[in-house]
Every structure is written in C-alpha cells, then in structure tokens.
C-alpha cells in the first residue's frame, strides 16, 4: 500500500494514501467474510509504509480490522533511511512485523519469504539506495530451508523486487541480482514455483517457455494496491485500485483481480477541476461506492478488463502523446492476462497482442496527464508527467 502521512507534500496531489489504505482494508475484510469454505491468509509484498517509521502503527491498526492473518515482506521503503546500513535499516520492520526472511507450510505448499534488497547509503548519506539479490546470510538460510522440502512440492516464493523476468522483458542476472544463478538453479529443481513480487508498480505475469530451464516457474508482479504512487489514483497498468485474490485447491492455483469498491474520502483540491475520467467505466456515489456507468451496479471482481472502442486508443504511446489519431481497432486491457490464458476474442476473431513497448493505459494516461497539465511539482522540481510502456495485457482487433 506504501502510505505516506496525510501532511506529506507528495501525498496531496489528489487523494491521501492513508485514506486509500482504509478503503483497501475494508474491501479485503468484506471480501474475506464471503469466503467460508477455506481459510483466508494475506501477503503484503513490501513497502507497507513509505520511509515514515511512525506509519507502522497505522499499518498494524489496519491489519487488526481484517479478520485474517497477514504475512509481510520487507520493501526498500520500509527501511529507516536515517540508519547507516542494511542491518540497522530493517530494525523498525523487525520490531513491528517480525523477521525479514522466513518460510512456512500451508496446505500442500511451501511458502518462502525473502529479503532481496540490500540497502546502502546514497549520495546524500541516506539509506535509500540498494543492491538487489540475496546476502550470503539469506542465501545460506534458503539452501538450508529447502533441503527439507520435497522436490514435488509447489513453492510459493515472495520477495519485494522481482527475482526472475522483469517487466521490461529483461531477465535478472548475476550482474543485477546477487546469487541469481544460484537461486535460479535451486528453484528450477522443484515441480512448480510461483514467484510473487511488487516493487515495479505495474502488473506483469510471465510464464517461461518449455524450452527454458526455468519452465517450472511462473512470475507474478503486482501493482500498488492503493493506485499510482503520487496521486493514489488509477494504477499505471490500467487497473483501478485493488489487489490479487489467489485461490488454492491442493496444488491447483488460480487468481483474479479484485478492484477496491470504496473511495470514501474526498479529493484534496490541489487542482481544479478534477480529471474528467473520460475513460473510467465507473463513478463513486455519495457514499463512496464505485458504480458502473452502464447500469449503476457496484464494481465487483467481474470487472476484469477495460475495453476501448474504435477511435479512442491510438496505435502507439508516441502517437497518443502526439495527438495523432484515430483507427478502426477495438482495444482491450485484460488485467492479469498471461500466456497460459487464451487470447481474448472480438466477434469470434482472436485479438492480436500489442507489443509491451507500445502498449499503455489510456485510462491512467488521462488522469496523469491532467496533473501534468496543471504543472504539479514533485521532488527536485520535476513536473508530474504521464508514463507509458511495459504493459503486457493489451490486445486489439479490427472493427
């Protein structure tokens, strides 16, 4: 969720992250209450706070409302940036939430939680820079832990930063991740590994091909649950604020996107007017409940894609920025799509996947561009600007 204090300058562009956290917790609590045929557990994939150690108290208060246990992963922003080294930086996390690497068994699966960010001082002598991968201590522990796990066991691996394929389709290597070849070889020995991560602020699922020595590994990178980092609005991959629900039945695992239903606290008023939300499919009623424009029904997990009619979505991100035109293609963003899914169809025709370097979220662009147009400033005087690319879930078909 990565919340800041409500008084933080970078938390006042649109919506307060702590407010969005409250809505997020309420949604998870209500969703969990509907699940009566199995136990419910949660996993936060890091950055449970944003460099403000006092917010651990708020986070713990939020967890108390959920009604189910939460397992936590250390993110880079969970470290105390006033500390002088990696060990001291994680002390506050450990005091409030426990160890930064551990394992446990649930059902037939073995869960492994790793700290894969090695914090170091930046040019301002603050603990905000980092190397990625495993320290010797964590690597030795991991080998010892898996020594007792049968190779037929499904492994659920969780770390803050992606440990395998990245959102830019660049494979992690020993140059970017300490002990990468070591842990890849170790996990490749198991029948199935699901590698979960956050950090990248966008959604990315990747399935290694049968020709790969990592063909047993599926990569799941999830976006920030409270939305885009600075505005706490739509996430940059084109989803509303929300989270991933993972259903486990023995060794079978499935998942879907769950949009957060609520937005109960108001706009900060830093810009006027608010974005038009021309490409959003829902609005919030007076009670802060998201309702679909098409029929007024509540926003539920049935909302798994965003469709753009012909003329709305330009062929590439660069064309869209330039304001160039229209085309006769229908575009769709299928939120958590991966290569094990079928490609979507339009009027019986299989849609073509748009290259990730060209794909973007028009819904997110409209919102971000609004704040950019109003000249909102971030740290260092940089303007808040739109972003695009690295979206792997956009398809199109000719109308």
Predicted regions and their residues:
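The substrate-binding groove and active-site-proximal loops of carbohydrate-active enzymes
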Residues: 10-17, 45-51, 125-135, 167-174
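Active-site glycine-centered loops adjacent to acidic/histidine catalytic or metal-binding residues
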Residues: 1, 46-47, 75-76, 160, ...
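Long, low-complexity serine/threonine/glycine- and acidic-rich segments characteristic of extracellular
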Residues: 303-399
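Extended active-site neighborhood of metal-dependent phosphoesterases/phosphodiesterases
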Residues: 53-149, 174, 178-194, 202-257
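Conserved acidic residues
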Residues: 40-42, 155, 193
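Conserved catalytic scaffold of divalent metal-dependent phosphoesterases
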Residues: 2-4, 92-171, 260, 269-282, ...
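Binuclear metal-dependent phosphoesterase catalytic core
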Residues: 212-337, 394-399
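N-terminal active-site segment of His-dependent metallophosphoesterases
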Residues: 1-56
């Amino acid at each position: 969720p990565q919340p800041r204090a409500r008084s933080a300058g970078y938390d006042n562009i649109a919506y307060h992250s702590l407010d969005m956290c409250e809505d997020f917790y309420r949604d998870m609590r209500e969703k969990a209450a509907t699940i009566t045929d199995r136990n419910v557990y949660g996993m936060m994939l890091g950055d449970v706070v944003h460099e403000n150690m006092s917010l651990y108290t708020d986070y713990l208060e939020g967890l108390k409302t959920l009604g189910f246990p939460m397992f936590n992963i250390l993110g880079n922003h969970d470290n105390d940036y006033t500390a002088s080294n990696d060990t001291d930086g994680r002390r506050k996390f450990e005091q409030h939430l426990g160890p930064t690497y551990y394992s446990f068994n649930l059902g037939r699966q073995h869960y492994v939680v790793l700290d894969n960010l090695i914090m170091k001082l930046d040019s301002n002598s603050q603990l905000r820079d980092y190397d990625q991968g495993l320290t010797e201590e964590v690597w030795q522990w991991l080998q010892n832990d898996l020594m007792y796990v049968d190779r037929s066991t499904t492994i659920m691996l969780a770390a803050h930063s992606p440990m395998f394929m990245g959102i830019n389709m660049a494979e992690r290597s020993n140059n970017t991740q300490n002990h990468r070849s070591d842990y890849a070889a170790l996990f490749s020995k198991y029948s199935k590994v699901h590698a979960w991560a956050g950090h990248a602020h966008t959604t990315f699922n990747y399935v290694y091909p049968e020709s790969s020595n990592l063909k047993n590994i599926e990569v799941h990178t999830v976006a920030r649950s409270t939305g885009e980092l600075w505005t706490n609005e739509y996430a940059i991959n084109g989803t509303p604020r929300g989270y991933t629900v993972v259903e486990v039945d023995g060794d079978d695992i499935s998942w879907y996107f769950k949009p957060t239903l609520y937005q109960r606290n108001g706009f900060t008023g830093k810009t006027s007017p608010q974005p038009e939300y021309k490409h959003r499919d829902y609005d919030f009623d007076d009670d802060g409940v998201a309702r679909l424009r098409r029929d007024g029904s509540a926003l539920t997990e049935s909302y798994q894609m965003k469709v753009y009619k012909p003329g709305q979505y330009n062929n590439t991100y660069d064309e869209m920025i330039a304001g160039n035109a229209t085309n006769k293609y229908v575009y769709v963003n299928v939120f958590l799509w991966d290569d094990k899914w079928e490609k979507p169809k339009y009027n019986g025709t299989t849609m073509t996947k748009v290259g990730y370097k060209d794909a973007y979220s028009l819904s997110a662009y409209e919102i971000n561009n609004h704040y950019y147009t109003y000249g909102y400033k971030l740290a260092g005087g940089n303007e808040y600007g739109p972003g695009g690319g690295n979206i792997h879930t956009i398809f199109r078909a000719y109308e």
